[in-house]
Amino acid sequence: MFANGTHGVQLTHGIADDILRELGAQGALHYRRGGPSNTTVVMYDEIALSRWVEEAVRNAGITVLLGAVLRGAARDGARIRELDLATRYGDAKLAATGFVDATGDAVLTWEAGFACREPADGPVYGTQMMVLEGIDEARQPTRAELTARARAKAALYGLVRTDGFAFVFPGRGTALVNHTHVETPLEPVAVSSNALLGKAQADKVLHFLKSEYPDAFGQSRVRSYGLPGIRQTRWIVGRQQLTVEDVRAGTKFSDAVARTAWPIELHDRPDGYIWEPFSDNHMHYVPFGSLVPAEADNIVAAGRCIDGDNAALSSVRVMGPCIAMGAAAAHALDLAGSGSVQQIDVAALRRRVRDNVERTD
């Protein structure tokens, strides 16, 4: 969301401006500046954000279909014509001129029969997050202390991941704990089983925190677990693939639609992850070509299912650039109309998303 350094400029605008302004006015945000990521991390009250999103959707007059599951997609050649959806209240058909694949797992692209990729070198691990309440903010261990203790005591407490952290939300007596690793397979029984495994891991982390840091966490309890956090599972084969070399070099593409300075953050082993932060003046970009399935005329992907290699995707699947990708996808489909997103005026698209690529105020 922000450039590197302790007070980097905001990189993503549009609805991001509205979220930061309105949640900030509610006291529902906390800005963590600097630290291991060398950037500004925005902590938020998850209830306040979810209600903001729901109200934004309602006020925009968007027709919603809650709890629907995609069962199939009907095609006419390179175009998706209609989606087959199931809800507990009955089946539904959804026809549209264009579609955004923001499913995370490229479900729309996959169900339509277009090419997709999966991690080639083993799984990318997900995380079961939890929010603790009743902590003592003044007695929190440092991140380095927590990691060293977790590594030393992992066998005793049955910890899988040893390099996690607990981010305190000042003034609320709460902490966001990110200290688990679970596989997130694309198979219904396995992913369901692993969701329970993730909570079991989180409970072991809580036991570790309460036992090893009783002054800080002794009176804490779980406020919420949330759904399993899925990082990288399956993504589109795009017109262009973003590479780790592009990320490290800060390649600015002629069709760039998003930017970020977030580190390479590849969770490719159970006990830890690759963490490669960048300098204060670093910036890397997401090309529109990586949002467009190479075989499709009316799909644009957004979020963690765009086309990138494992390491590149690990750096651009975070919230700031994902918001920018969503905006770019909507504008691209608007420009395409009943035509193909493969043939839109990229210069016109760049003008529409300029704030998310060029703005520096």
Describe each PLM feature range:
Residues R71-R75, F165-V168:
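Short amphipathic beta-strand and strand-loop transition segments with alternating hydrophobic
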Residues M1, G14-I15, I19-G24, D91-G98, ...:
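Flavin (FAD/FMN)-binding glycine-rich loop and adjacent Rossmann-like elements that form
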Residues A73, L85, M130-G134:
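Short beta-strand element of the conserved SAM-dependent methyltransferase core
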Residues L66, R79, A216-G218:
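Short, basic and Ser/Thr-rich N-terminal targeting/leader segments
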